[in-house]
């Protein structure tokens, strides 16, 4: 039996050209005198797509987006580049369940952008109060890379979470949707966490001061 004539075959979009990443790197260098590496810009682009897909998944109501990446992606959209994504678990769910639900997120990213994202490995260090693992992604550049995801299991959130759109960040990321909402920590909550982190000698992250 042949398919209906008006049924269109699904065509997966191609990944945004590497040229777009190169043009963005050149534009930022011309504007500020500092060239951002293409692999850093690619990570920013791929993580934007991951968050956009996450916002449409069953994980949206149980994860609170936080940290420096949340400041950039949901509040300011500036040139603050993160190597990881931080969340807080809002419901008691085992890591295995989260990893299973993430398969739908990977599929959405691939079908909508052509970017390949997949679970890579758990963090080699033991974490008492967090699920920490790495994602492997392949985007516009020929070689893939990874990004760290840290999900705090138990944390007292003082201020109400906000539901905010995921910012595209740059005009060159034209295919990243901007009308998708995600649960994110309030500015007050993020500022409080960053202030506490400044006094944590074991942490030693200069970005905490920059974010404030």
Where are these regions (language model features)?
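Short histidine-centered catalytic/ligand-binding loop motif
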Residues: 35-36, 86-95, 198
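N-terminal, well-ordered alpha-helical segments
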Residues: 45-52, 61, 69, 83, ...
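Active-site nucleotide-donor binding segment shared across nucleotidyl transfer reactions
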Residues: 55-85, 91
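Short, conserved acidic/polar surface loops in the N-terminal third of protein domains
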Residues: 74-78, 98-101, 145-147, 161-163
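Metal-dependent nucleotidyltransferase catalytic core
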Residues: 89-125
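Helical scaffold of the NTase/Pol beta-like nucleotidyltransferase catalytic core
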Residues: 2-64
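Catalytic cores of NTP-dependent nucleotidyl/adenyl transfer enzymes across multiple folds
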Residues: 2, 26-34, 44, 48-52, ...
């Amino acid at each position: 039996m042949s398919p209906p004539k008006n049924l269109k075959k699904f065509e997966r979009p191609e990944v945004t050209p590497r040229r777009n990443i190169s043009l963005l790197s050149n534009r930022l260098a011309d504007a500020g005198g500092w060239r951002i590496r293409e692999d850093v810009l690619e990570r920013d682009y791929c993580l934007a797509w991951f968050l956009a897909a996450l916002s449409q998944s069953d994980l949206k109501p149980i994860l609170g987006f936080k940290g420096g990446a949340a400041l950039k992606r949901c509040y300011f959209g500036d040139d603050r580049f993160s190597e990881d994504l931080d969340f807080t678990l809002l419901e008691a769910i085992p890591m295995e369940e989260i990893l299973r639900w993430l398969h739908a997120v990977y599929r959405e990213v691939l079908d909508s952008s052509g970017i390949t994202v997949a679970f890579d490995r758990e963090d080699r260090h033991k974490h008492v109060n967090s699920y920490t693992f790495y994602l492997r992604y392949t985007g516009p550049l020929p070689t893939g890379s990874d990004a760290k995801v840290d999900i705090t299991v138990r944390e007292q959130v003082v201020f109400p979470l906000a539901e905010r759109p995921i910012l595209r960040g740059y005009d060159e990321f034209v295919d990243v949707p901007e009308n998708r909402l995600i649960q994110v920590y309030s500015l007050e909550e993020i500022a409080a966490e960053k202030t506490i982190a400044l006094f944590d000698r074991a942490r030693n992250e200069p970005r905490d001061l920059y974010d404030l």
